[in-house]
Amino acid sequence: MAQRAVWLISHEPGTPLCGTVRFSRRYPTVEKRARVFNGASYVPVPEDGPFLKALLFELRLLDDDKDFVESRDSCSRINKTSIYGLLIGGEELWPVVAFLKNDMIYACVPLVEQTLSPRPPLISVSGVSQGFEFLFGIQDFLYSGQKNDSELNTKLSQLPDLLLQACPFGTLLDANLQNSLDNTNFASVTQPQKQPAWKTGTYKGKPQVSISITEKVKSMQYDKQGIADTWQVVGTVTCKCDLEGIMPNVTISLSLPTNGSPLQDILVHPCVTSLDSAILTSSSIDAMDDSAFSGPYKFPFTPPLESFNLCFYTSQVPVPPILGFYQMKEEEVQLRITINLKLHESVKNNFEFCEAHIPFYNRGPITHLEYKTSFGQLEVFREKSLLIWIIGQKFPKSMEISLSGTVTFGAKSHEKQPFDPICTGETAYLKLHFRILDYTLTGCYADQHSVQVFASGKPKISAHRKLISSDYYIWNSKAPAPVTYGSLLL
Amino acid sequence: MGPLSRDAWAQRLGAFRASPSAFMAGPEGEDLGRDLLSDLRSEKLSEQTKVSLLALSMEYPAQLWPDASAAEVAATSLLDTLVLLPPRPSALRRPLLLAATTALAAGGALGPTSGASCRLLPLLLGLAAGSDLGRGFVPASEQRPLQATACECLRELESCKPGLLGGSLGLLRGLLGQEGPVQPLSLLLALALRNTLVLQSRVGAGLGGLLTDKVSPTGGGPWDWTLVEEGDGRLQPQAPSWPAAEEGEGERSLTAREHSPEEARELRAAVIQLLDTSYLLTPVAQAQLLWLLGWALRGLQGQPPALFKPQLVRLLGTAQLTLLHAMLALKAAFGEALFTAQDEALLLRRLTLAAQHPALPPPTHLFYLHCVLSFPENWPLGPEGEEAAPLLLGPQLCRGLLPSLLHDPMALLARLHLLCLLCAEEEEEEKGQLPSPRHYLEELLAGLRQRAALDGGPRALATLCFQASYLVACCLAGQPTVLTPLIHGLAQLYQARPMLAPHFVDLLDQVDSELREPLKVVLRQVVVSRPGRDEALCWHLQMLAKVADGDAQSATLNFLQAAAAHCTNWDLQQGLLRVCRALLRAGVRGGLVDLLQVLARQLEDPDGRDHARLYYILLAHLAAPKLGVALGPSLAAPALASSLVAENQGFVAALMVQEAPALVRLSLGSHRVKGPLPVLKLQPEALEPIYSLELRFRVEGQLYAPLEAVHVPCLCPGRPARPLLLPLQPRCPAPARLDVHALYTTSTGLTCHAHLPPLFVNFADLFLPFPQPPEGAGLGFFEELWDSCLPEGAESRVWCPLGPQGLEGLVSRHLEPFVVVAQPPTSYCVAIHLPPDSKLLLRLEAALADGVPVALRTDDWAVLPLAGDYLRGLAAAV
């Protein structure tokens, strides 16, 4: 269970190489083991240059995909995981764990402790999950709180020293690189015994516990016979516990109001020490019934120093917060659109913001627009072929608003207007963006009185909640729309 | 050279990292390793720079110190540098330990005879034990971090030399129980324990007191090089618990060796000790611990895997990739012994849930989905090593894992695979209220094709569509309800976007005939029904070259005829000719002749005309099987050569006559003495089946008239062939050598040419009898001949030795057909006609026991020496 090498590569489309190796680290002792384990099937880790080229080709990130290239485009080359075989100098380097996120490619080569011919199943290679965790750890470190390029460069320059702590020999010791940074900074602190490895020091100061619940709601609405609208809530509970002592114990309970929607698919942080079996088994896979466990959801844990995600959950609320329809028809040279949105009465009518984005793909710039709206203002981005309906902080008393109008487009030019493979012809969507503070759709809240802390001093407990939209689509009901299998379940 | 400045080093390291091989090949390469070691002691360089030098040495020791002795020297130097550090806190101690360990382990210098190893190992163990190493070697503030580092170094050495720390198990256990740093010690102990158990079981030994003996690290040292040697340097895989990974390594399993009750108790206590404190480890370290202990305990009697249960209950709620993966490893290792049927169902549910949980990143989803399809079931039904839906994974559970057009390509393909597996099982499933997966699959594929058909869309969309079609064709072969609409849809896609022709050709190459054949038919119909002059002509021709065959000839030829007028450039003409070639191969003749003739006249490009003419000639002259071979893929050309080269090579192989070793043997039978000419009887024999054999003979020295070739339609080994008759037309009565050439076709259709060993025509082979004189007139006839020889001819007397068979035997064996007058057993008169018009007359009279005097006359004096030799050789020739 070790990594032979790790790379960070920035993806730079339009440049000659289409990318630059920003960081790489090799582990020669692991490489030596790979040579013994893999035997005749051993393929050495290449230098950065060839690796970069082969990886970008495999990930289809080179600019040139004009022609059919069999080694890339053949129908039988099917990758179903983020684990690749790279052709380098006539040999295939496998397995290479790699993914692209925010224009940065994260890649590593886990050690396989046996021959590679025939290829062992991925699930049997312990280094694969470790490789993912390693790359996720680096990604979290680079992008936590990072705002601009110079901060990114600073963090990249810290990586060599951090990996000397977190992964000195290719076997990952801690995926949380921030821990290693703190460890380097506070190396002189004498650690008492039984200090957890995931907690590099102890907190000194006023005890406080902060709990914030963020719910994201996503939805696909079709307004069609035979296709069900779908929506889902995904919650994240984040905690920051500033408590004295090596191993303070905390229990947080999440509660629901009487008509709240049960939490399902709960995943917890590894610091949670035990879980009620009702929490473990409550799942969205099963059909819902009244007997579903509805809390309180108790999470006993020993907190790490940093802010962490105590748990994730999903929930199926009975109605979507905003129900709408979108009708778009092509009429000779123009499009006629009609939009209707209705806020459900049970939802808190106090938004931080609420907007409907109405994009028109695969068309030219907007040249003419006539519209009528019952509420809010419309902003027009002619070159981007985009309308934004700014609804504001509150829906009107009727809770229902509408927009109708006609749009005319100029000639299409490929560079400026967005291409979309799905929104062709009259297939189109509008996407809602909104945020409501101090509110959750499930009703889920962390009762401050139910937070139990077994540590010296009475901590100050603060709790926050918010609801935000994410992938909230309303499809044109007058044209075909992509459906999920779930939408066919009527 | 003095020490380099910080900037000079930064520049040098940058140049090295850009391309280590290029740097090492350059002028500075040789000195880099030496300079690095010496500058580590320079007082002018900052610690930060020195750390970067050490970091480099940790990454590229093989380049800096390419052999074991150089690595040994480097490790010694690094240790010296460590010892020489002033007794104050320094950022160098940790990296120096790491670098020395790396140099020894990666350089292959680690061993009982290595001085550096014998210094490093006690130092590391001393640091790990937190013992006082004297002289302020370790400042108090660094003690704790160095203790952890020493454990990491020891773990790496143990990884590279399994069994090295077998003697230190007791010590490590003791340290873990006291105040040592939990994570490094736990991982080190678990690894050493695993390796020791594996090695001990292999040599049939027990743990003995290893887990309890506390060796003093300052003593002789607990290094167990013997155990390392017994391990034969062979590294132990961590994941053999996986059934599929285990195949082919028979002697791997830990033979269920029984430990003594004492040993078993200690082992159990050690494992429990490790597991109980595992919550103090980081999640990734916990996962490692579980993998190691799972492997250590697998197959050990008396060690119930239930020890793991408390940890599993704690971890089942997390979605940490490494932890869930480790749990699956335990599942694979212990099966039902650790996971009851209910546990199994719960684990699969958690896994299914994690594979779609919106809070997790897409790469995690994909890996979990792979884990679902490779789930180590307690009672697996299907073949091992193949992805399949576990039995417990019903349609209800999969609902959220099905693909939609909104997924990215990888997620779509992974989920599509699952959907295909569901469709394959659908027939057995009861039709519930769920919508039909097969119908959903059809819709999805239609959506993918629609996107691929978008004008100007990226190639990735097309590739995805064809990958999906291929996946479906593989998983659902034999399901016409799926394949029929797929074929129909693909044909429509081609109609919409002919530029996808290369993808179609690739798909046809990859899929089984079940999809390929009907798809070919449909695509051919789509192409030939077009007018043959649109802008996509080059794609149509590419497609047609793949799908054209003997069926629907006239439509295809009509299309080509129409297209020919529009093939104005080289590319198109080549495309057109490729289709002709495909038709030629498929055995199309009729209309193709006309087309090729037209092309040979009409095409603008001379190369095109030449090719058309060549194809025409081939078509006109070669039989269908030969044509197939001539145009078939060439065996001679390597696969990557261009098609033109391949074509030429193919022609060379197929149309030229190949020099080959002789596959046929000829032997000379007894000659026939009838008719006006001497005739040789040849017996052919084949080593392999050969066809259309033509034997050509050439007479050396033009002694005979040129010989006709002999033809044999077919020869097979083991099947007796009729003898071949070769009439000779001598120009003078003399023996001769015949050169023999064979020309034949092999069963693969190649025409070969071979030299056979020469045949020798003997003097006697030319003998012909004179016409038989009337009864009783023999003597007169003979005397007349005898007298006619002189005076132009020659006369001689020869002693012909006789063998045991006597004169009678000799005559009956060799001269019987030529005897004119016989008075057995003493006197014979022999008259031989030698074509073209010579005669040889022999009187054999008054034979003695050992010989007979022969009086001979001939009208051709040149025959005399030949006759003499012949007679003298007769006795020996018996």
Curated annotation (Swiss-Prot), chain A:
Record keywords: Cytoplasm, Endosome, Lysosome, Membrane, Protein transport, Transport
Keyword Membrane among record annotations: yes
Intracellular or extracellular location(s): Cytoplasm, Cytosol; Late endosome membrane; Lysosome membrane
Sequence similarity: Belongs to the adaptor complexes medium subunit family.
Domain MHD residues, every copy: 206-476
GO cellular component, as recorded: AP-5 adaptor complex; AP-type membrane coat adaptor complex; cytosol; late endosome; late endosome membrane; lysosomal membrane; lysosome; membrane
One BP annotation, GO: protein transport
Superkingdom of origin organism: Eukaryota
Oligomeric and partner information: Probably part of the adaptor protein complex 5 (AP-5) a tetramer composed of AP5B1, AP5M1, AP5S1 and AP5Z1.
Keyword Membrane found: yes
Purpose: As part of AP-5, a probable fifth adaptor protein complex it may be involved in endosomal transport. According to PubMed:18395520, it may play a role in cell death.
Spans through the membrane: none
Pfam families, alphabetized: Adap_comp_sub
Family matches, as PANTHER family: AP-5 COMPLEX SUBUNIT MU-1 (PTHR16082:SF2)
Tissue specificity note: Expressed in various tumor cell lines including Jurkat, Hep-G2 and HeLa.
InterPro entries assigned: AP2_Mu_C_sf, AP5M1, MHD
Gene name as annotated: AP5M1
Membrane topology field: Peripheral membrane protein
Gene3D superfamilies in the record: Mu homology domain, subdomain B
Name of the protein this chain belongs to: AP-5 complex subunit mu-1
SUPFAM superfamilies for the chain: Second domain of Mu2 adaptin subunit (ap50) of ap2 adaptor
UniProtKB/Swiss-Prot annotation, chain B:
Organism listed in the record: Homo sapiens
GO biological process, one term: vesicle-mediated transport
InterPro entries in alphabetical order: AP5B1 (IPR038741), AP5B1_barrel (IPR048980), AP5B1_C (IPR048981), AP5B1_middle (IPR048979), AP5B1_N (IPR048978)
Its job: As part of AP-5, a probable fifth adaptor protein complex it may be involved in endosomal transport.
Protein known as: AP-5 complex subunit beta-1
Annotated keywords: Protein transport, Transport
Region (Disordered): 234-260
The keyword Protein transport belongs to this UniProt entry's keyword annotation: yes
Biased composition (Basic and acidic residues): 250-260
Subunit details: Probably part of the adaptor protein complex 5 (AP-5), a tetramer composed of AP5B1, AP5M1, AP5S1 and AP5Z1. Interacts with ZFYVE26 and SPG11.
Pfam families in the cross-refs: AP5B1_barrel, AP5B1_C, AP5B1_middle, AP5B1_N
One GO term describing the cellular component: AP-5 adaptor complex
Superkingdom, taxonomy of origin: Eukaryota
